[in-house]
Amino acid sequence: LDPKLVAQRMMGWTDARTMPTAERLQALLAPEDAAAPASGQPYPFFLASPMSGEVHELGSITEWQAEWKWDGMRAQIVRRSAGISIWSRGEERMNDAFPEIVDAAESLPNGTVLDGELLASLPNNLLPFSMLSRRASRKRVGKKILAEIPSVFVAYDLLEAHGKDIRSEPL
């Protein structure tokens, strides 16, 4: 059994609302072909790390890729037959805190997983991380919070398309 598959299945495993059962353990350890990605499980998050070598060791600048460092919360949007889930890198499901993102994700094709950043944003103005954090900590988001601290999702990677894991494919 591929350890990466077990790691993916373990995302959200510690959900306090779900009791451990023999069935959940069997699903965790099931052969790869027996567990199609129909659930809302995200992929393990890969975080950036500081460069350990010298800049000249990176090769030609024409081969480089860079991403903007947003002041938001890393998240994955999972759109599969089981529905839509927004996951934090801390393995928390955040659907209740970001209902407008869930609504927008309805337009994604089934079998899509996006990696990106949740941001608090007014038109033409990103809001501070502290406001996003305040919103994310709420179990229920009312109209006032939706108006004061609207959110957007900036996707920077497509991890799954049409139900196929494409993380190992070239950009």
Residue ranges and their predicted role:
Residues 1-171:
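N-terminal nucleic-acid-engaging modules of covalent nucleotidyltransferase systems
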